[in-house]
């Protein structure tokens, strides 16, 4: 088990996301320098440094399923119109739109989930465990784990990428940031399904 202080320190040093830092530290058996190297090799540290840059350009990527019953629009932003016109960027938009069609996320990031939804989920999880006889601190750990699973299932950035489950959508985007050299982000999306 990796200490949360180590994860925070790695995040402060690289700007990478918490889950990326935790995975890198686990892979490096807690070695900070090796974890930084792992993040650099994956392009995540580089991507994190670009994350604060403004993304005022981009595209609306569209995907319509072959049966014409599911359609997705996704706003994918970057820093310049030059990048927005590249084949790599447009392909990324198409991949993300197809992923949304397949996996039906509800929000882009966990920060986008309304607090009342989070509280309701926690309440449901606590109710499921109230008669378990487990101590309160154990129940809270279980609730936290279930909540993380909820985010992984419902937040686009935390979902396993539908076409390569070895990475999340966020990791796919960070790889593109490292390759393209500009900050990239999904601003919003909408999925339409006939009859819903």
From Swiss-Prot:
What main location does UniProt list? cytoplasm
- Keywords of the record: Cytoplasm, Elongation factor, Protein biosynthesis
Region Involved in Mg(2+) ion dislocation from EF-Tu: start-end pairs: 80-83
Q: Which GO terms describe its cellular component?
A: cytoplasm
One molecular function GO term is:
translation elongation factor activity
Top-level lineage group: Bacteria
InterPro entries tied to this protein: EF-Ts_dimer_sf (IPR036402), Transl_elong_EFTs/EF1B (IPR001816), Transl_elong_EFTs/EF1B_dimer (IPR014039), Transl_elong_Ts_CS (IPR018101), UBA-like_sf (IPR009060)
Could you tell me where this protein is found in the cell? Cytoplasm
The entry assigns this protein to a family as follows: Belongs to the EF-Ts family.
* Entry-linked NCBIfam families: tsf (TIGR00116)
Give the protein's recorded name.
Elongation factor Ts
The root-end lineage is: Bacteria, Thermotogati, Thermotogota, Thermotogae, Thermotogales
